[in-house]
Amino acid sequence: MARTKQTARKSTGGKAPRKQLASKAARKSAPVSGGVKKPHRYKPGTVALREIRRFQKSTELLIRKLPFQRLVREIAQDFKSDLRFQSSAIGALQEAVEAYLVSLFEDTNLCAIHAKRVTIQKKDIQLARRLRGERS
């Protein structure tokens, strides 16, 4: 809606303003406590929605590379010691893992919404995996 210039209008009567109670007047006239400004806080959910939009726009990896690499090497130790990995192999593993997790969380969110909830729970992940046929 376009902004329009507002002109002063003559009062046409109406109700007269009531007198303020003593406590209300005292509250309004009291000075601000030491001029300390409260830190700004967004409403619950605002930051979460902003993060969702930010991460949906981006294409970079969400898991840090070195911790992921350590995890892969730790898991590989159980199968064979002294395994060596090309950096491109670890990169491909990380891409695949993140794509799988994002897809799983999308399905999990749909399960939570189907149950008329907005919070995902363990049972939503279990249901999503069961529907995919990953776990009987």
Swiss-Prot record:
SUPFAM superfamilies: Histone-fold (SSF47113). The keyword Transferase does not apply. One of its GO terms (molecular function) is protein heterodimerization activity. The modification Phosphoserine is found at residue 11. One of its GO terms (cellular component) is nucleus. It comes from the Eukaryota. PANTHER family: HISTONE H3. This is Histone H3.3. It comes from Scheffersomyces stipitis (strain ATCC 58785 / CBS 6054 / NBRC 10063 / NRRL Y-11545) (Yeast).
